[in-house]
Amino acid sequence: VISAPVDMSSAALSMHSFLSHRIYTPYLLNPIIKKALANDITKDEIDSIKAVNRISDFDDIFTAPRHGYRSNNHYYHASSALPYLIKVTKPLLLTSAKDDPFLGFTATPNDVSDTVTLLETEHGGHVGFIRYNVDKDKSTHLYKQSRFDINWLPETVSAYFESIGVPFNH
């Protein structure tokens, strides 16, 4: 599992930070507002949706009630994976980055079963795991001549599968 918010309430709060609210919220919110307005909804719902400026507000007035939840908090609680990670019985690699603007709180070793491996990197943002390529001049492959190497994530996932005895094609 890569860059998945396991605690939806915490992820929603992280979207209230200045940077997330100014940069990511418009990018993510505008398309879902447009889709919501295309539904058969009342004028009051249209006015409420048009007034939204946070994803959590949208979830409170549209997403949660449309899916049978009392509020955005009820929806977030019900859709969070965190309470279930302690019950996982199959091997699972949960990869996240400390600088991911979407995740908020991530799982700790006390939150997960022994079959869950937590891998939290200092950097990587949201699914942006790269490493500095120190051998860029030695490579004959054009994509490897870049300063940054995008192979960290696939190589890490491959190594994880191999470590638990699952063959993984490179």
Which residues does each PLM region occupy?
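Catalytic active-site module of serine/aspartate enzymes centered on a nucleophile-bearing elbow/loop
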Residues: 122-170
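Acidic beta-to-alpha connecting loop that harbors the catalytic carboxylate
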Residues: 82, 98-101, 123-125
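Short secondary-structure boundary/capping segments
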Residues: 14-19, 109-111, 134-137
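Short conserved micro-motifs at the rims of enzyme active sites and ligand-binding pockets
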Residues: 11-13, 105-107, 129-133
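Alpha/beta-hydrolase-fold enzymes
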Residues: 1-67
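The feature captures the conserved acid-bearing segment of alpha/beta-hydrolase catalytic domains
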Residues: 77-89
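Conserved loop-alpha-helix segment in the C-terminal half of the alpha/beta-hydrolase fold
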Residues: 104-117, 121
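Short beta-strand/loop motif that positions the catalytic acidic residue
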Residues: 88, 93-96
